[in-house]
Structure formats: structure tokens, C-alpha cells
Amino acid sequence: HDFETKQLRAVRFEGDIAIGSRTRIYDSSIANYHIGEDCYIDDVLRMECRHRSSFGEGVGVSAVNENGGRTAYLYRDLTAQTAYLMTMMRNRPEAVERIIAMIKERAEEHASTIAKVGRGTTIIGSRFIREVNIEEDVTIEGVSHLENGTVGRGSLMGVDVRAKEFILSDDARVEGASSLERCFVGEKTMIANEFTAVDTLFFANCHLENGE
């Protein structure tokens, strides 16, 4: 109802699109996203939700046993305690199975064919963002490829970052050509300088650089 044409320039939309008040989108291609108020999106090659997704929730992470046993499952509010119960309490199989079932139920409840960008978020100079829910006041600048994930409030994802099947908690930072696959990044955790992680759970206030 308060849309103004000057909010858009050289934009291609496909599918189900919603745009909040005062949001500006320039030189970008977007499909199946609902974008909140006061966002700024500029020079994004492709931001799309191609199919139903749970945005990283319910993804199995083999953090303890690389052969796939003792799997922890990602969800937005994962804690070290819950991860410990899933991976280390195998003498209580019924309890572990119930926790995993609850996480999978939650993932299914949150699944959608439309992804979201929260209020006050900035996304600029980025290549591919696919099936990623982005919360409020996030900054995404110069990422290479994000897929099947959630980016928590106030977080930053920077230049040449790649991430697939991931969840970032609030105020986390991933920058400097770092790469994540099947990872949980806890609140205020910083990952930088080409750090690479696969099947890893980082809880609050970690700082990782130059390694894997």
C-alpha cells in the first residue's frame, strides 16, 4: 500500500515476492522471498528459494564420529547441552530418539517454499543465496554461495564466504573467504581468514582463523 517505484531499479522478480516499506532493491535477481522493512539489497546475482526447505534445521552433523554415528541435528536454538545428549548419551537410546524426533518435527514445522529476509538487513555484492532464511539487522557483503541455512539476528557474512547446510546464531561473524558445510555457529562466534569447517558445532564466543 505504500510501495514506491523508486524502491526498485534493474530488478528481476520471480515467484512469490513481498517487499516491506522503505526497502530498496537494485541490480538483483530474486525468487520466492519475503523481504521485510528497511532492507537494502544491491548487486545480488541470484537470491532464490527453489524448493521447500527447512533452512538448515534438521541437518545431521557427524561432529563426533566421521563415519556417521553419534549424529547431532541442527536447529535454530541448539545448545551444547542438547548436542551432548544427542551424541554422548547413546546408553539412553529412547531419550536420544525423542530429542531427534522433536528437532525433526520442528524443522518440518519451519519448512517453507518461501524464504525470508528480516527487517533492517543489508545484502550487497553477492553471488548465490539459495534457500537461506535471513533474520533482522544482518549484513551480507560479497558472499560467494550460501545454501540451505539460517543467518541469525545481527550477524555478518563477508567476502567470498561459502556456507552450505548451516545455522548462524545471533551476532555471529563469518568472513574472509571462510567455508562452512554442515555447521552450527554459536552466538558472537567469529570465523575468519579462510577458515574451513565441515561437520562442526561451534558454540558461543568461539574465535577461529587460518585453519580447518
Q: Where do the language-model regions lie?
A:
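Domain-scale signature associated with acetyltransferase and cell-envelope carbohydrate enzymes
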Residues: 1-212
